[in-house]
A protein has these predicted regions:
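Entry/N-cap segments of selected transmembrane alpha helices
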Residues: 83-114, 235-238, 294, 310-339, ...
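Intrinsically disordered, low-complexity non-transmembrane regions of multi-pass membrane transporters
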Residues: 1-7, 185-232, 279-283, 437-440
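Hydrophobic transmembrane alpha-helices of secondary-active transporters
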Residues: 19, 45-52, 65-93, 269-278, ...
Length: 440
């Protein structure tokens, strides 16, 4: 297509929106898609990739889809601080969930970095950063893949975005396909504390259509519509935080030319700062977590669709063999960690917590919640309660990994970064195992 204009963005948005609706129709009508809980946004991205300029060339999609994904991730992170409120739960159980999740995240990053540098790059001419496309896509999903890929692109390694997006797409499919297999095996072997046999998926989860009696509000109307729409206020707040994030990122680059802080991480910092300041005022009473969560979900749907549709098939083909080895070895490592560590760290409901963690360690939080809904339909494990609190400590580490990894790897310190992740991950796991034995 020609030069970029505002209508170029409108056309891209319209096409992707149409594909999301097609994806939703496919999810509702086709049992195979329902069985594996494939999100409409993923279907939209795959269709857009197949029909777009990278493959068949039937859709007039521009070459800006990857840029849109990079912008949308800033909106997701800007809204993140406002999507939940924190409280206190049983400290010991929250601590175990934190250690299990944080240790696993660090070890997955260490594994990807080390296998890329010490094994794959010795066989193929690869950049040091090749290996971390696996944890960026698996543990972080399409959001983190877009974030880290955009950061690497700004530093001259544009292929990382495609590799990480491919990893995220493979991960989200494996999270459900293998997750359901693990669930059936575990139930048959008596690991489950909540099920006696593998349960079938509720229709609401399969089709994604919520029955009229089960529908919940996507937010509260905190302003009178005669003054300003509640959605307008929350969207304006999110956009303002993204602007602050952009200015902070550009300002940091001017003050320290070697420092390239991604806009998304600066937006998260800006959001956390604003939230911290506003908690002392009555403004906090007019920020609705459900509304911010709904907006974040919308941004994420478009992020996933744009991200997958922007995958460069030529790059995937160029790296197909080492990428396949990386992703398969990552699945094996994650499987071993998830189930072996859970069995030794958690005193009760270890299998349910492992199934949930498998979902988000390879796919997304939504995949983990879907698997947990099957494994623990009555929420007896309180897994989500503990994880919600633990994530307050996990999130800063995750954002730090995504923020600083591109700068460190492109400067040739990838091995040091991976070894630090390994040491920290093993330290957390050792502490949790010792603590678990003492508290028996």
């Amino acid at each position: 297509m020609g030069s970029f204009t505002p209508w170029t963005m409108v056309i891209d948005l319209g096409i992707i929106s149409a594909l999301i609706l097609v994806g939703k129709y496919i999810r509702v009508k086709f049992p195979f898609v329902q069985k594996f809980l494939i999100p409409p946004s993923v279907l939209a991205g795959v269709i857009g990739l197949a029909l777009g300029p990278e493959v068949l060339g039937w859709l007039p999609i521009s070459g800006n889809l990857g840029t849109y994904a990079g912008i949308l991730i800033a909106f997701v992170f800007a809204s993140l601080p406002f999507t939940s409120s924190t409280g206190s739960k049983e400290f010991g159980k929250v601590k175990r969930m934190w250690g299990y999740s944080q240790g696993g995240m660090l070890l997955q990053w260490a594994f990807g970095g080390l296998i890329g540098i010490l094994v794959l790059s010795r066989i193929w001419p690869l950049n040091e950063s090749f290996g971390i496309s696996m944890p960026a896509g698996y543990c972080g999903g399409h959001g983190s893949a877009a974030a880290i890929g955009s950061a690497f692109a700004g530093l001259g390694q544009e292929e990382v975005l495609t590799l990480a997006m491919t990893a995220a797409t493979v991960g989200i499919i494996c999270s459900i396909v293998l997750g359901l297999i693990f669930l059936r095996i575990g139930t048959r072997r008596g690991y489950s504390s909540c099920l006696t046999q593998a349960e079938t998926l509720p229709e609401e989860l399969r089709t994604g259509l919520v029955a009229k009696d089960n529908r919940r509000s996507i937010g509260e109307e905190v302003f009178s519509s005669i003054s300003v729409s509640t959605l307008t206020f929350h969207l304006s707040l999110t956009a303002l935080i993204v602007l602050f994030g952009y200015l902070l990122s550009r300002g940091g680059a001017k003050l320290a030319p070697g420092l390239e802080l991604p806009v998304f991480s600066c937006a998260y910092i800006a959001g956390m700062t604003i939230k911290s300041l506003w908690k002392y005022t009555n403004i906090k009473d007019y920020i609705c977590p459900q509304t911010m969560s709904s907006l974040s979900g919308m941004f994420t749907d478009y992020l996933v669709a744009f991200g997958i549709a922007s995958i460069k098939i030529s790059i995937v083909g160029q790296y197909i063999v080492p990428l396949t080895i990386l992703l398969l070895s990552g699945l094996v490592f994650t499987t071993l960690y998830i189930f072996l560590a859970a069995k030794h760290i958690f005193k009760e409901y270890w299998f349910e917590k492992a199934i949930f963690s498998w979902g988000w360690f390879t796919g997304t939080m939504a995949m983990g919640m879907a698997l947990l809904r099957i494994a623990d339909p009555q929420s007896r494990s309180k897994c989500m309660d503990y994880y919600a609190i633990a994530y307050v400590l996990i999130a800063p580490v995750e954002i730090a990994l995504i923020t600083f990894a591109p700068m460190i790897f492109t400067r040739g310190y990838g091995l040091l970064f991976s070894l630090i992740c390994l040491i920290l991950g093993l330290s957390v796991m050792t502490y949790m195992l010792i603590n678990s034995r003492r508290s028996k």
